[in-house]
């Protein structure tokens, strides 16, 4: 890490007195979701991140240069760093070894206002103790002050007490190995790629820190060394290399500044795509919902380009570039590091510190205007792209105004004519089904509860918005009815408070065409109405694949395995299993039972756990470049089941 950061971290003594205790650990095993969000595979990987984050905090303090993560044959994971280790003495308040306090007492750590850490991602201080509580066992080896200290825990309890194992020479740092408790987690097998993605982010965000990820499981042996001296500049280059588009200027624009104990970094580069990719972090934690640092960046970006364009005569009179205009094709990383980070939730998804907005705004305004003055050719390329986006946005605005005017003159509702609306007016109680084709839509209209279920049949070809600007979106006969029906607008006009339905359910056939429609609609929502996904409004209906029946006995199967199970249950002989080729084959009663009735249907909620991965996947699947799409299909075809081709 750079000397500037080390100086601002104000390294001071890190000893036993700086471990502060806030409360006990009793509730973690009973209510794990309160501490790690979920006991699904996402929560499982969260355990790894909690331990690694402690090592990253050592790196932020300038005390750690290398972190080794190993997935072992028994699906345990070890994390080893060369930081300072944990203070080896006794905690005066509890009369216990400090190491034991860190792993058995909730909210015990050196990150609550003492001088052990000036900047830390582990704000809530639950990491080590929660991992201990939710693991079958944890083993810790602490190297500090020339001695090696060890302790073993099982399900949060001390199994082998704290003890000194002898001298360790010059070695320093912490080794933690844990095995998640199978009675807590739905899944206990770690995914290498999931951990790799997170560790790559951490390596980019902490320039110079080496992270080595190793998988020792039989048949899966591999190792990745992550070490990026370029920091977030390398991060932007990496993102643009992942098929988001071709950069329109050679070098990544890098800006950095500080105030007090706060440091802000921004790296950005434009490509020839129509989408924006802004990824933000606070103390190395991904802030997927944005926050004050993103707001400051966007405000300054728009101001800087407008100021430059006016100063150079590119913009005349009252002409203005909007935020959407200047962000088209942008790939940007925003990373802030600060003391007393205020997040708006335990999940740390949105930063709330108002002073960070001011800091980022100031840095970007000053540094970006300097860059534009010093690089007029690059400035011209970027502004020309923004002007093209502006013209497309203006064309879209005129198309919207024309459509509204036509509706008023013709005396018709702005709701699409094909929409079979529901009676309930309170949005949170309602749902709308986006149904493939008129034939399926006809059955769907009959097989619904019209009190709260609306049906919108899709007609025409859904536009691939990955390759289109906003004016093309407003000219698409399939997307316009969706925009009208939902009522909340898109892009900069989006207002989630105007959403007319609580659930938006995509319902398409289980064939290639149906899959294509689903990905086209998801791309549209992700690019133009992303808060719908972020706030849990978008769902995928899961209609059955088979009807299994014998006489009057009927079962619906959602997989081949379930089909075989029902055939066996019904006696085998004389049982018929019919594959549904499309939604139109179901009568209204069957549609109600399998896809509409809340007590029997299956819905998949669409969520964004990793914004970078989502962005990359949509770019690969729906972008112009064929080769990365071919690679993706080749790598993921093995995961596809029950698709009619």
Task: Show where each model-derived region lies.
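GHKL-family ATPase ATP-binding module
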Residues: 1-18, 25, 49, 57-59, ...
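Conserved short strand/loop->alpha-helix "switch" segment adjacent to the catalytic nucleotide/phosphoryl-transfer site
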Residues: 30-49
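Conserved ATPase-coupling elements of RecA-like P-loop NTPase cores
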Residues: 61-63, 88-91, 445, 517
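Catalytic palm subdomain of template-directed nucleic-acid polymerases
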Residues: 72, 79-83, 87, 506-518
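Short conserved segment of the HATPase_c
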Residues: 86-109
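C-terminal interaction appendages of subunits in large macromolecular complexes
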Residues: 391-411, 426-431, 442, 446-448, ...
């Amino acid at each position: 890490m750079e000397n500037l950061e080390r100086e601002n971290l104000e390294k001071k003594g890190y000893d036993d007195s700086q471990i502060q205790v806030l409360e006990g650990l009793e509730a973690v095993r009973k209510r794990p979701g309160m501490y790690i969000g979920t006991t699904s595979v996402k929560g499982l990987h969260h355990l790894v991140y909690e331990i690694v984050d402690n090592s990253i905090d050592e790196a932020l303090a300038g005390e750690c240069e290398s972190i080794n993560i190993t997935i072992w044959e028994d699906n345990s994971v070890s994390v080893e760093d060369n930081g300072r280790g944990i203070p080896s003495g006794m905690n005066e308040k509890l009369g216990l070894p400090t190491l034991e306090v860190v792993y058995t007492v909730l909210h015990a750590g050196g990150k609550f206002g003492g001088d052990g850490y000036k900047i830390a991602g582990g704000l809530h201080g639950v990491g080590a103790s929660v991992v201990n509580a939710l693991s079958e066992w944890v083993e810790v080896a602490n190297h500090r002050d020339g001695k090696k200290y060890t302790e073993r825990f099982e399900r949060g309890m001390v199994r082998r007490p704290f003890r000194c194992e002898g001298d360790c020479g010059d070695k320093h740092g912490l080794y933690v190995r844990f095995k998640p408790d199978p009675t807590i987690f739905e899944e206990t097998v770690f995914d290498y790629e999931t951990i790799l993605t997170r560790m790559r982010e951490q390596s980019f965000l902490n320039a110079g820190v080496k992270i080595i990820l190793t998988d020792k499981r039989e048949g899966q042996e591999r190792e990745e060394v992550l070490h990026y001296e370029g920091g977030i500049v390398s991060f932007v280059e990496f993102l643009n290399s992942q098929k988001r588009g071709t950069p329109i200027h050679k070098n990544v624009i890098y800006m950095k500044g500080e105030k007090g104990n706060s440091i802000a970094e921004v790296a950005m580069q434009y490509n020839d795509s129509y989408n924006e990719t802004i990824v933000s972090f606070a103390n190395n934690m991904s802030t997927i919902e944005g926050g004050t640092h993103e707001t400051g960046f966007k405000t300054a970006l728009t101001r800087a380009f407008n100021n430059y364009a006016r100063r150079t005569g590119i913009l005349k009179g009252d002409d203005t570039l909007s935020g959407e205009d200047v962000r088209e094709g942008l790939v940007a990383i925003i990373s802030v590091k600060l003391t007393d980070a205020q997040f708006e939730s335990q999940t740390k998804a949105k930063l709330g510190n108002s002073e960070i907005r001011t800091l980022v705004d100031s840095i970007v305004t000053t540094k970006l205007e300097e860059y534009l003055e010093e690089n007029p050719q690059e400035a011209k390329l970027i502004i020309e792209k923004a002007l093209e986006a502006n013209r497309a946005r203006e064309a879209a605005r005129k198309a919207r105004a024309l459509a509204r005017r036509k509706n008023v003159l013709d005396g018709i509702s702005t709701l699409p004519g094909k929409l079979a609306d529901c009676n309930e007016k309170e949005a949170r109680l309602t749902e709308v089904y986006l149904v493939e084709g008129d034939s399926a839509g006809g059955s769907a209209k009959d097989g619904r509860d019209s009190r709260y279920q609306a049906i919108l049949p899709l007609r025409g070809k859904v536009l691939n918005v990955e390759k289109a600007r906003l004016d093309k979106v407003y000219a698409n006969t399939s997307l316009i009815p969706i925009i009208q029906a939902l009522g909340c607008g898109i892009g900069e006009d989006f207002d989630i408070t105007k959403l007319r339905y609580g659930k938006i359910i995509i319902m398409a056939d289980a064939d290639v065409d149906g899959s294509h429609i689903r990905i086209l609609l998801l791309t549209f929502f992700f690019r133009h109405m992303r808060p719908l996904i972020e706030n849990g409004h978008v769902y995928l209906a899961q209609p059955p694949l088979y009807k299994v029946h014998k006489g009057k006995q009927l079962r619906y199967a959602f997989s081949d395995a379930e089909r075989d199970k029902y055939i066996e249950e019904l006696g085998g002989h004389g049982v018929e299993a019919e594959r549904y080729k499309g939604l139109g084959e179901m009568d209204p009663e069957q549609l109600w039972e399998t896809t509409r009735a809340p007590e029997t249907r299956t819905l998949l909620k669409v969520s964004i756990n990793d914004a970078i991965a989502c962005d990359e996947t949509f770019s690969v699947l729906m972008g112009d470049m064929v080769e990365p799409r071919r690679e993706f299909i080749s790598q993921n075809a093995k995961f596809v089941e029950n698709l009619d081709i």
